Swiss-Prot record:
Top-rank taxon: Bacteria
Source species: Methylococcus capsulatus (strain ATCC 33009 / NCIMB 11132 / Bath)
GO molecular function, one term: large ribosomal subunit rRNA binding
Assembly information from the UniProt record: Part of the ribosomal stalk of the 50S ribosomal subunit. Interacts with L10 and the large rRNA to form the base of the stalk. L10 forms an elongated spine to which L12 dimers bind in a sequential fashion forming a multimeric L10(L12)X complex.
Entry-linked SUPFAM superfamilies: Ribosomal L11/L12e N-terminal domain (SSF54747), Ribosomal protein L11, C-terminal domain (SSF46906)
PANTHER family (UniProt xref): 60S RIBOSOMAL PROTEIN L12, LARGE RIBOSOMAL SUBUNIT PROTEIN UL11M
SMART domains: RL11
Protein name: Large ribosomal subunit protein uL11
Annotated function: Forms part of the ribosomal stalk which helps the ribosome interact with GTP-bound translation factors.
Ribosomal protein in keyword set: yes
One example of a Gene Ontology biological process annotation: translation
């Protein structure tokens, strides 16, 4: 018989840097999950990912206080900022442009994000990432 699910916890945790401090500790503690067990498992699973890259994680908590978790790919905005070497996007994306992104860069990011996107094909995924880039105040070339 399947375990009874008591809830889901969605967090963004930096790869290889999960520790019991906020936001991880309080979110897991109020559900009765063993915090250190999660931190060790998360850090072990993300050891091959670039350290410090924020990863969305969905933790499923069961009635017996056990858990499972699924890590997702980093947010598109983080990957775009990393690809262009930016600290942040534009505060006024419609008027102030902070950089230019090429189709090749968009395709590279779309390949990485493809498992988490609902896009039917690569072209749709590239357009999705291009939309994120435009919202950040980036000029999109070749789309």
């Amino acid at each position: 018989m399947a375990k009874k699910i008591t809830g889901y916890i969605k967090l963004q945790v930096k790869a290889g840097e999960a520790n019991p401090s906020p936001p991880v500790g309080p979110a897991l503690g109020q559900r009765g999950v063993n915090i250190m067990e999660f931190c060790k498992a998360f850090n072990a699973q993300t050891q091959n990912v670039e350290k410090g890259l924020p990863l969305p994680v969905v933790i499923t908590v069961y009635a017996d206080r056990s858990f499972t978790f699924i890590t997702k790919t980093p947010p598109a905005s983080v990957l775009l900022k990393k690809a262009l070497g930016l600290k942040s996007g534009s505060s006024k994306p419609n008027t102030d442009k902070v950089g230019t992104v090429t189709r090749a860069q968009l395709e590279e990011i779309a390949k990485m994000k493809m498992p988490d996107l609902t896009a039917a094909d690569m072209d749709a995924a590239v357009r999705t990432i291009a939309g994120s880039a435009t919202s950040m105040g980036l000029i999109v070339e070749g789309v």
